[in-house]
From Swiss-Prot:
Keyword Ribosomal protein belongs to the record: no
Cell compartments where the protein resides: Cytoplasm
GO biological process: pyruvate biosynthetic process; ubiquinone biosynthetic process
Name listed for the protein in its UniProt record: Probable chorismate pyruvate-lyase
Length: 179
């Protein structure tokens, strides 16, 4: 994992998350992206020839390593930590960090622990019953600039996972207007 990617992932843990009604959106275009209720992967795929995943981490972390706000959203249990970079036509667009509780991994249509380089959203939103709640957004301030981020809890067949996404500078979220 290169240094900027490590910095991006670390910054996702430091975001001051806000509810949509409290967040100051830079523009309507970004608001539409951040409030997306469907699959971000599918949406990104519409803006490139090829959407690829660079898998950075995919392993179990203990409940005590979760931040308190993460534990509140998921319950206190060990989770599969999946960290990725989503790339559109080989250009990094989104850094993603997903926590999937062990109980969410069992009795599912799909083996989420074996996603590999398949975008998680494509699998999750193919399930029979998917909902999103606890949507939050925020800003990440880094030497490379100011980036939008969002976090939400996805329910796949009534079992939760927590997904955080950092939109990098070349992401389509910034296409209409630069932040």
């Amino acid at each position: 994992m290169n240094q900027p990617t490590s910095l991006y992932l670390a910054s996702l843990l430091e975001v001051e998350w806000q509810k949509p009604e409290e967040f100051e959106f830079p523009n309507e275009f970004a608001k539409h992206w951040l409030e997306e209720q469907g699959s971000l992967s599918r949406r990104l795929k519409q803006h490139c020839q090829e959407l690829t995943v660079e898998l950075l981490q995919n392993h179990i972390v203990t409940a005590k390593t979760l931040k308190s706000d993460e534990s509140q959203l998921l319950s206190e249990q060990d989770c599969l930590l999946r960290e990725v970079v989503l790339c559109g036509d080989d250009c990094p667009w989104v850094v993603g960090r997903t926590l999937i509780p062990r109980t969410t991994l069992v009795d599912q249509q799909y083996d989420l622990a074996q996603q590999g380089d398949i975008p998680l959203g494509l699998t999750v939103f193919s399930a029979d019953n998917v909902e999103r709640d606890s949507l939050q957004m925020g800003w990440v301030h880094l030497p490379q600039g100011r980036f939008l981020a969002r976090r939400s809890r996805l329910w796949m067949n009534h079992k939760p996972m927590l997904v955080a996404e950092l939109f990098l500078s070349n992401s389509p979220i910034y296409a209409k207007e630069r932040v």
